[in-house]
Design a protein with these regions (language model features):
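Central antiparallel beta-sheet cores of small beta-barrel/beta-sandwich binding domains
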Residues: 1-113
Length: 113
């Protein structure tokens, strides 16, 4: 599961969406350092929002299960909970906060991405 991932995020709450990049690095056991870098358009502006968190990733056969939590600060919506599933080629994560919820869809990038 370690390495680079790329895809999109989508808010089911307000329909915001954009490009999402992710880097997963194993720390120890089932804990992975996770760096997300989300982008979205707000009018003519492109907003870039990077953040880090630890995720728990456990393997169940050929599938992986993801859980985590991150406090993105009051302006970004507060505390977000994450859970999802994946394979070595695709990750689908649901996220939820008090005033937002949606999905992350990630795949392995092409070498040029």
């Amino acid at each position: 599961m370690e390495g680079r991932w790329i895809g999109r995020w989508h808010s089911d709450y307000n329909q915001h969406n954009g490009v999402l990049r992710c880097l997963l690095m194993k720390k120890e056991g089932s804990t992975y350092f996770t760096r997300f870098h989300a982008k979205y358009k707000w009018g003519l502006l492109t907003i870039s929002y990077p953040y880090d968190m630890d995720m728990t990733i456990t393997q169940n056969g050929a599938k992986y299960e993801f859980t985590g939590e991150a406090d993105l600060g009051k302006l970004a919506g507060g505390v977000y909970q994450y859970n999802g599933t994946g394979t070595t080629n695709r990750i689908d994560i649901n996220y939820r906060a008090d005033k937002d919820h949606g999905t992350f869809k990630l795949e392995r990038p092409e070498d040029s991405e």
